[in-house]
Amino acid sequence: MHQMTLAEIARGLADKKFSSEELTRVLLSRIATLDPQLNSFISLTEDLAITQAQAADARRAAGENGPLLGAPLAHKDLFCTQGIRTSCGSLMLDNFKAPYDATVVSRLASAGTVTLGKTNMDEFAMGSANESSHYGAVKNPWNLECVPGGSSGGSAAAVAARLLPAATGTDTGGSIRQPAALTNLTGLKPTYGRVSRWGMIAYASSLDQAGPMARTAEDCALLLQGMAGFDPQDSTSIDEPVPDYSASLNTSLKGLRIGVPKEYFSAGLDPRIAQLVHESVRELEKLGAIVKEVSLPNLQHAIPAYYVIAPAEASSNLSRFDGVRFGYRCEDPKDLTDLYKRSRAEGFGPEVQRRIMVGAYALSAGYYDAYYLQAQKIRRLIKNDFMNAFADVDVILGPTTPNPAWKIGAKTHDPIAEYLEDFYTITANLAGLPGLSMPAGFVDGLPVGVQLLAPYFQEGRLLNVAHQYQQVTDWHTRAPEGF
């Protein structure tokens, strides 16, 4: 039962082959047995899950029948969940229980999903390895000595290990797509504003976007359908009609124009990954796609620009955590200033402190024009590069990551090396574009992903390409040994 995809679960529930409660109990038992190896969950919500599963079964018995009704999933632990701890992977919020549900959580709950728990993540979503969590590193089920990617590493590891069929994640610079690539999943970052950020604890507000993580494009389409749509409570939400993502999955790729940027194949890319990217291109050509080379000339400036803009926004967003209203508070402060200093110094981990300091520096008087303003200008140039490319092609294809998963601890003391792992993913966030990673093979037994990018609000096109690719390849069906 645990091997089923979300779509298979939907069909099984509709055909009354099993109940949501039966499935939920099987998965909760599996999590209890296997997750100690992975550390993919921060909180389990067994009682809530059973209650929601029973309610879903009752709704189905009354004649209701939706694709997510009774489907089990987990939420990344930065989505507010009423009465349940929302820690953001940090000591700072270790005791925080939100008084409301995030829009993503409430929409999926209304569709009938069953919440099994909250997944582990890099502290405040800052990281590409899921090593900065206050609750310990998450392990990659494909090799327990390796990282699963980050910051949505808990969601990725749990789905890859078949602990559950799907999970929510967030993507600020690749935090859905990169862990999806490193754990053999399909992960989608929607267009900025497509999915509500209300109730999602912010890292960098102009870059953050929530999205689905699952084993197949078909499953991501089902989950995105339940997540997407305008939300008046989110000022950055865009009032754009939500199409039927599942309806376009089987569209032919004949005549689809795929662009491959020449700048993607630089010295930093593992040549074995480059080979797998070229093989995926050939598969899509067999399906009728037309492939041509495109150029993204400002790609080389993306990482410096991102690591000015994201920390700058983080330094502002995280200023609210001061030990006064909620969150961690130091013991016996001498005065208010001491309360602020010690609560933040003790409550935040080293990577979060590093990014706050970088961001505060970039925004400080005398440096704002030199750093932050210049970074925003580069952001505009990167967006323009994509607009020029999309004048000639429908989709852009390339690697998701320059390397497969690395050993836990290998890049802990070299943050720049970890930042470089975001090279291919951060441009979609800077430009606000939708991006998807899909399984494309293995290097040394570790999964590799290929990334697809499309114009604004063309998530359906990405899901269509990925689904058609998954009809002629079997990479996405491979499971890690022992799980």
Curated annotation (Swiss-Prot):
Its EC number is 6.3.5.7. It is an enzyme of class 6 (ligase). GO terms for molecular function: ATP binding; glutaminyl-tRNA synthase (glutamine-hydrolyzing) activity. Transmembrane segments: none annotated. GO terms for biological process: translation. Belongs to the amidase family. GatA subfamily. This is Glutamyl-tRNA(Gln) amidotransferase subunit A. It comes from Pseudomonas syringae pv. syringae (strain B728a). The lineage of its organism: Bacteria, Pseudomonadati, Pseudomonadota, Gammaproteobacteria, Pseudomonadales. The gene is gatA.
